[in-house]
Amino acid sequence: DKPSERPGGNPGTQTDPAAEKKPATVFLAFTDSQTMRDSMAALKKYSLQGSFFLTEDEILTDPALVFELLAAGHTIGLTVPDGEADPAAALARANDALAALVCQKTLLALLPAGAEAAEGYCCFFRPAAPVTAAEAAASETAHLLVCSADADAALYTLYTSDARTLQLLETSDYA
């Protein structure tokens, strides 16, 4: 087709493929064990995998959840509550709880914004100002989307915007 032959096309104009907006890249992270089963169901609906970040207390309180996450092919990471005085020690305790339960540890950690990175972990940081799914989907830069409630609505927003949704892993190219 020549542009002038398309309905609404202007003679002599062409669309620059480089000018077309690329789909957003969004790395998915899930927190809050109370909503993780709903998040798993939403991910399954969209045929996606996610990274789920648990505290030591969440691992100890709901060990069945850890097994369900792993059985569904999701990645387990660790997190600490906001205001944790010693994030590195809290991560070590959570990793020990995980290892006692499933005989494996993780290097993946999601820490509060401004926390110091814990040695020996691949640390990602929750955004200081949380990003919504709509903001992440409209962005041209990669975003970390931390979901703790209503994952289905967030995933729908990403899906309808053709965003590229990726599981946050130790090897993720997100800074």
Stretches found by the model and what they are:
Residues 81-175:
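Catalytic domains of cell-wall/extracellular-matrix polysaccharide-remodeling enzymes
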